[in-house]
Regions:
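N-terminal Rossmann NAD(P)H-binding glycine-rich loop of SDR-like oxidoreductase domains
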Residues: 3-20
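Adenosine-cofactor binding site in Rossmann-like domains, unifying the SAM/SAH pocket
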Residues: 22-44
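NAD(P)H-binding glycine-rich loop region in Rossmannoid oxidoreductase-like domains
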Residues: 36-78, 87
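Catalytic helix-loop patch of NAD(P)-dependent Rossmann-fold dehydrogenases
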Residues: 68, 75, 80-83, 103-142, ...
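NAD(P)-dependent short-chain dehydrogenase/reductase
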Residues: 133, 137-184, 190
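Substrate-binding strand-loop-helix patch
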Residues: 150-151, 175-184, 204-221, 276
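Mid/C-terminal beta-alpha module of Rossmann-like enzyme folds, strongest
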Residues: 188, 195-245, 285
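Amphipathic terminal alpha-helices
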Residues: 269-285
Length: 285
């Protein structure tokens, strides 16, 4: 089996490579190797390589910047998915596309099921919903949330840096979701692909947290592992205290019950996977 991975240098792209099952031939490409916004480039590569699976982890993820660059966000997160989907259909490949909790407006009080109507709050979310529509026709669309990994820019890395540099950190406490380790997501994606899952599915780690809860846990676990040498106050603030160009959903917990049933069990709790990720940093840097 051959699998094409776009966005190979990102958190999920790296995790897919490190968790690939035995016997899978990987073609992992970054933006410098494949411009997914070029329909001709996508078609030519897919026709030449003939992958069985196409994992699209490439994305425009600058949530705030997207408010002033919506055309660019839509091109990468929306139109380009259509190019990949078309190439997949033409060659018989299966597309596995990564989407987001930002598809929802956050007004719910219970986890969002996969068939909940999308209602994005901003440009980034709108662009990702366009991508979901473009990816239809047999694709697996996996919505996830609050992803982080050992590499790249993410909340865990940012908190570790700030906690080492500052006398206190301030973190919003009124946005609720579920932190998700990229390795956990990647392992699930391989299994879902093996099960020939299609349509929209939800996957995050188990449990619920605010960004404040997540930050507190990061400090506690990092101190226990010696990644931080001192504790600093973590101050809870509200979203109103920390205005940003893009609005964020206040509640974006996803209902994973169907996915967990497909996989034969629930994902580990987010704090368990946080500890695993920090141990990976401790070992490999």
């Amino acid at each position: 089996m051959k699998a094409l991975i776009t966005g190979a240098g990102g958190q999920v792209g790296r995790a897919l490579q490190s968790t690939a099952p035995p016997g899978v031939s990987l073609l992992a490409l970054g933006s410098g190797q494949l411009d997914i916004t070029s329909a001709d480039a996508v078609t030519a590569l897919v026709e030449a390589e003939r992958p069985d699976l196409i994992f699209n982890t490439a994305a425009y993820t600058a949530v705030d910047k997207a408010e002033s660059e919506e055309d660019r966000a839509r091109l990468v997160n929306g139109d380009a998915v259509g190019f990949l989907s078309s190439a997949a259909r033409q060659t018989g490949a299966r597309l596995i596309h990564i989407s987001t909790d930002f598809a929802f407006d956050g007004t719910a009080s219970t986890p969002y099921p996969p068939d909940a109507p999308p209602a994005p709050l901003g440009a980034y979310g709108r662009s990702k919903v366009v991508g979901e529509v473009e990816a239809q026709n047999g694709a697996l669309i996996a919505r996830t949330a609050w992803a982080y990994g050992s590499h790249g820019h993410n909340f865990v890395r940012t908190m570790l840096r700030l906690m080492a540099q500052r006398d206190e950190v301030r973190v919003v406490t009124d946005q609720i979701g579920t932190p998700t380790w990229a390795t956990s997501l990647a392992q699930a994606l391989w299994r879902m692909a093996d099960a020939s899952a299609r349509g929209i599915w939800h996957y995050t780690d188990s449990g619920v947290a605010s960004w404040y809860d997540f930050a507190v846990a990061i400090q506690e676990e990092a101190l226990a592992l010696g990644l931080l040498d001192r504790a600093v106050p973590v101050i809870p603030i509200t979203t109103a205290d920390f205005p940003t160009p893009a609005r964020r959903p206040a509640y974006s917990v996803l209902d994973k019950s169907a996915t967990f049933a497909l996989l034969g069990g629930a994902a580990p709790h987010w704090r368990v996977n946080l500890r695993k990720m920090l141990k990976d940093i401790q070992t490999h840097g």
